[in-house]
Amino acid sequence: FRNVESKSCCPNTTGRNIYNTCRLGGGSRERCASLSGCKIISASTCPSDYPKFYCTLGCQSSKCASITTPPNSEVDAEAVRCKAACSNLCDFGVTTNQEIQDD
């Protein structure tokens, strides 16, 4: 067996704190990453799409979730436009305080 050092990549300090608390409580890396929004990585840097993913997810859940979408309606088109706007917003100027830590 090869020993692979794993690291956790968290989107921000809150995610890091949740991850660490979970791990201290005996949670597995995978479970704690799932709860905290962190990722388990073997590289020394977070994946390049990581900040965009969380930006888009947060934007869509906070701004687009309230749009009700009956099938084949104009409201459905509004939801699509909202999601596209979030994606465009997050494509430019996304900066986060990602935290990487050895596990």
UniProtKB/Swiss-Prot annotation:
Lineage: Eukaryota, Viridiplantae, Streptophyta, Embryophyta, Tracheophyta
Similarity annotation: Belongs to the plant thionin (TC 1.C.44) family.
Chief location of this protein within or outside the cell: secreted
Propeptide section residues: 53-103
Annotated PANTHER family: THIONIN-2.1-RELATED
Cystine crosslinks: C9-C46, C10-C38, C22-C32
GO MF assignments: toxin activity
Protein name: Viscotoxin-B
Swiss-Prot/TrEMBL keywords: Disulfide bond, Plant defense, Secreted, Signal, Toxin
